[in-house]
Regions:
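Short, small-residue-biased leader/transition segments that mark boundaries at the very start
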Residues: 1-12, 188
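N-terminal lobe/hinge region of extracytoplasmic solute-binding protein
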Residues: 8-9, 13-53, 170-171
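Gly/Pro-rich hinge or "lid" segments in bacterial periplasmic/extracellular proteins
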Residues: 37-40, 114, 124-125, 131-200, ...
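Surface-exposed binding/hinge segments that line
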Residues: 61, 78-80, 91-153
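Ligand-site clamp/hinge motif
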Residues: 192-237, 378
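Structural transition elements
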Residues: 293-339, 358-362
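Extracytoplasmic/peripheral linker and loop segments enriched in polar/acidic and small residues
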Residues: 321, 325-327, 378-389, 414-481, ...
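Long beta-strand-rich cores associated with HINT superfamily self-processing modules
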Residues: 478-504
């Protein structure tokens, strides 16, 4: 299969610290657990697992005969090393607290005492994890890419460079990288040492790297690639009804990050004004041609509350200051801006909006320029390449930036944790004591009703303080040749090619 999934040249990643590139890398690495075709947790490197009655001890039993792609044995000790490495302050993994913050000894490990992390291997096939508080979704974390194993000998022999070349990129998944041509493609070949290699029909997968969705579309039309993830927006109307065009929801929100260390956004009224001036229905249904849904809270459809119901349906209306009347919202925005000392936008610095040029991002940027212009605010649009965009945003080199998050698991904490003080993915540097306290409560209580209330309280605080500006809820839309069989898409924004095939 030849597929175009990403535009970044920075695609080979250190599994323990990666943030993007997951669509490719899930084919070369496998965690203890994985996600099956129905979106359910399934055995991966671990064949079975159990949790103690108090919810504090998780035990995973590995399969017999696990191997690395170089043919060497893979044992529970490899997971111990890798999970402790995630906590290493030198590695500085952005997801560390998200995936291991509930494990006993995490804080000490983050401070440099890696052996304090309560992860152990009593034998070569058993991994024991002790939690400081129950985590009902921990099995989802055990399927999350950051907790993939990495080969200790290779990492220690090559340092950070281990993850930058195909020959040192030793992995344990159904495929392994055999060729990487920066800016062109990454080729993965079937891993004969994978535990389920007999079920893998494809000999190789070629991931083509293209920054331009129009070029990808041309390649698809010519048959050079059989799958493209980023469909040019102008082509969508003509593709409606085409059996090769697919649209499915995912657990994601398209939102705006404001650099809250910038004095321009110090007043919550300014932040509310920017939010109120956005016509979300117009953005989702007109600009995005109905491929997204309007977002009025951070946590969208599909996220599961503690009782199994929809978290979004139970939302308390954190953005209750936004009415159904957009004209009224616009007038309120103007008043809030005046209350903040910027009547008609006077005195407010020019806002630079930074985004990458893919999908609807440029279209949304131009809309924001016009919408905020209605408030008298001057907006400049800064378009940067994807490979530069994420580091710029993470380093705070922006005023307002496009952002987005697709769930790694269906618990709402996965979305809300982003905004905890000090979180590695908190690009806007939102910091609020009430929010942090609510999230701490959600992480520590064993009562499901209390946990639900705490999570909703956290979202309410985030929305009322406008720690970010939700704009739309994601759907994934893609083109897939009818020649491709056996692949599937998950609500987490991933495509699974490993058990696919090409029909003759």
């Amino acid at each position: 299969i030849s597929a175009c999934l990403v535009g970044s040249e920075m695609c080979i990643r250190d599994r323990n610290s990666a943030v993007d590139g997951g669509n490719m890398l899930l084919h070369s690495f496998e965690c203890l657990l994985t996600i099956d075709q129905d979106g359910k947790i399934a055995p991966g490197q671990a064949e079975t697992w159990e949790v103690s009655e108090d919810g504090l001890t998780w035990t995973f039993h590995l399969r017999d005969g696990l191997k690395w792609s170089d043919g060497s044995d893979l044992t529970a000790d490899d997971f111990v090393y890798s999970w402790k490495r995630v906590c290493d302050p030198v590695v500085a993994a952005p997801y560390a607290e998200t995936v291991l913050g509930m494990v006993k000894g995490f804080d000490e490990a983050q401070a440099g005492d890696l052996d304090a992390l309560a992860v152990s291997a009593p034998d070569a096939k058993t991994l024991v994890v002790e939690l400081s508080n129950p985590c009902p979704y921990f099995e989802s974390l055990a399927a999350f890419a950051t907790l993939s194993p990495v080969q200790q000998a290779t990492v220690e022999a090559n340092g950070d460079a281990w993850a930058t070349a195909a020959e040192t990129y030793i992995s344990n998944g159904p495929f392994y990288i055999t060729e990487w041509v920066p800016g062109s493609h990454i080729t993965m070949s079937k891993n004969p040492n994978y535990w389920n290699a007999d079920a893998i029909k494809l000999g190789s997968i070629k991931f083509v790297l293209m920054e331009d969705s129009n070029a990808a579309y041309t390649a698809y039309q010519s048959g050079d690639v059989l799958f493209i993830k980023d469909v040019p927006t102008q082509e969508i109307p003509s593709l409606q009804g085409n059996p090769e065009f697919h649209v499915e929801p995912n657990l994601g929100t398209y939102y705006l990050s404001m650099n809250l260390e910038d004095p321009a956004f110090a007043d919550v009224n300014v932040r509310k004004a920017l939010s109120l001036a956005i016509d979300r229905d117009y953005v989702a249904n007109t600009l995005m041609q109905g491929t997204y849904s309007p977002a009025y809270n951070l946590v969208g459809e599909g996220w599961v509350d503690t009782d199994g119901s929809s978290f979004n349906a139970n939302a308390n209306g954190g953005q209750s200051y936004i009415s159904d009347d957009f004209d009224a919202n616009l007038e309120e925005a103007k008043q809030l801006l005046a209350d903040a000392g910027y009547p008609n936008g006077e005195g407010l610095p020019t806002i630079t909006y930074t985004t990458n040029d893919a999908g609807y991002h440029k279209t949304v940027a131009e809309y924001l320029q016009q919408a905020w212009g209605e408030l008298g605010i001057n907006v400049e649009v800064n378009i940067v390449e994807w490979s530069s965009f994420t580091p710029m945003r993470r380093n705070g080199e922006y005023m307002v930036a496009r952002n987005g998050w697709v769930g790694d698991y269906s618990d709402p904490s996965n979305m809300l944790d982003l905004f905890c003080t000090g979180n590695g993915n908190n690009d806007g540097k939102f910091s609020n004591a009430d929010f942090d306290a609510a999230m701490e409560k959600a992480a520590s209580t064993m009562d499901t009703a209390e946990r639900s209330a705490a999570l909703h309280q956290a979202e309410d605080v985030l929305m009322e303080q406008v720690g970010c500006i939700p704009v739309a809820y994601y759907n994934d839309f893609w083109l897939q040749s009818e020649k491709i069989t056996g692949i599937w898409h998950s609500a987490y924004g991933y495509w699974y090619f490993m058990y696919g095939d090409i029909a003759e």
